[in-house]
Amino acid sequence: MIGKPKFKKGDWVKFEWKGEIIEGEVWVVDAYGTFFQTKEPSYDIFSPKKNMLYKHMEESCVTKIDYKP
């Protein structure tokens, strides 16, 4: 729901990116979406395995994981 994000900074989550499951830590919460997407919160997620920051990942594509990879 816009303005009420499911995840918070520091949560560990996973999502699919180009057919691959990526696990990472939420670094930024955009509670009201972004410039091009205002229907749901989005997140900037850092994956240490890939050494990559994935920006503006929509909440509907993200799932919380209960462990730190």
Residue ranges, per PLM feature:
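Short, solvent-exposed secondary-structure boundary/capping segments
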Residues: Y32-S42
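Intrinsically disordered, low-complexity, charged/polar segments
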Residues: S42-P69
